[in-house]
């Protein structure tokens, strides 16, 4: 896990002969001004992965950044992706960037349809239009479909997929199989560990959590996938076991927003609200 350095001040920093630029590029939260000042020293592969960069900055240093990492770890607009369509990694773009159906259609020959079928939110109309490109098994377990659509295409939904579970079914599972406390039969209070700067541990450039705010994401609803996409939360101990070097947050998740609860009682959800920071 990424751990930030202590007592690092960009204003007073003076490099020396044995300065570990790899360590700084990975573990210190750097400003774009600092990165530019030491552009010939920093490790651009790790800058591309671990630092939050603006599109303007990426453009300025387009020959230095790692475009594979740009496509995976930075949040890019469709306009920016289109401008640098020959530089970005379309495999990662198809997974890690949020794409509109219009954009996917425009670049249908570049996107990875297997990943599009799994990671992007698609309408039934769009799926039908590109029925020869999409991967139907993934469509059946990752896209929320109407009963009529499922019957029309003779799709089979495995029992391990929670995508169609009702609120009542989720509620019963929680009460029978976990120790999570259910409040008013409507929501649960659980925990999320984040970095010291309140950013996501796994995707620091995509989520920075603030008290009182609600966050949404697409979510893998398959119970047998322990580590997958979606907003995650645990018991207090589970959150600390995952990452204990940063902040611990109390979060609220409505029952209907739960995507699944894995065998290890890890929660993946579509939406959660940050309530407060837990001070030990």
Task: Describe each PLM feature range.
Residues 177-217:
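Core subunits and conserved enzymes of cellular information-processing
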Residues 216-280:
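ADP-ribosyltransferase catalytic core
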Residues 109, 174-189, 239-247:
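Short, surface-exposed loop and linker segments with low hydrophobicity and enrichment for Pro/Ser/Thr
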Residues 61, 96, 107, 130, ...:
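Broad hydrophobic/π-residue packing in well-ordered secondary structure
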Residues 1, 10, 212, 222-225:
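Catalytic phosphate/metal-binding cores of nucleic-acid and nucleotide-processing enzymes, i.e., regions
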Residues 138, 189-190, 250:
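Generic structural signal for residues positioned in beta-strands
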Residues 1-178:
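Alpha-helical scaffold segments
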């Amino acid at each position: 896990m990424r751990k930030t350095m202590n007592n690092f001040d960009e204003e007073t920093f003076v490099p020396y002969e044995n300065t570990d630029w790899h360590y700084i590029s990975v573990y210190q939260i750097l400003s774009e001004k600092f990165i530019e000042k030491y552009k010939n020293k920093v490790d651009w592969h790790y800058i591309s992965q671990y630092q939050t960069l603006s599109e303007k900055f990426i453009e300025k240093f387009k020959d230095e950044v790692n475009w594979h990492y740009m496509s995976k770890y930075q949040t890019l607009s469709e306009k920016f992706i289109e401008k640098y369509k020959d530089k970005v990694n379309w495999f990662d773009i198809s997974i890690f960037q949020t794409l509109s159906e219009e954009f996917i259609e425009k670049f249908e020959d570049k996107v990875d349809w297997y990943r599009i079928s799994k990671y992007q939110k698609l309408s039934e109309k769009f799926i039908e239009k590109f029925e020869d490109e999409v991967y139907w098994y993934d469509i059946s377990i990752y896209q929320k479909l109407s009963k009529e659509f499922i019957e029309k295409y003779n799709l089979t939904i495995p029992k391990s997929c929670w995508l169609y579970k009702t609120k009542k079914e989720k509620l019963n599972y929680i009460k029978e199989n976990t120790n999570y406390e259910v409040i008013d039969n409507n929501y649960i209070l659980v925990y999320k560990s984040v970095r010291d700067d309140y950013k996501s541990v796994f995707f620091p450039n995509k989520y920075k959590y603030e008290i009182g705010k609600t966050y949404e994401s697409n979510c893998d609803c398959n119970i047998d996938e322990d580590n997958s996409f979606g907003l995650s939360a645990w018991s207090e101990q589970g959150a600390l076991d995952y990452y204990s070097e940063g902040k611990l947050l109390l979060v609220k998740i409505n029952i209907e927003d739960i995507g699944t609860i894995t065998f290890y009682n890890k929660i993946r959800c579509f939406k959660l609200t940050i309530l407060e920071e837990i001070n030990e």
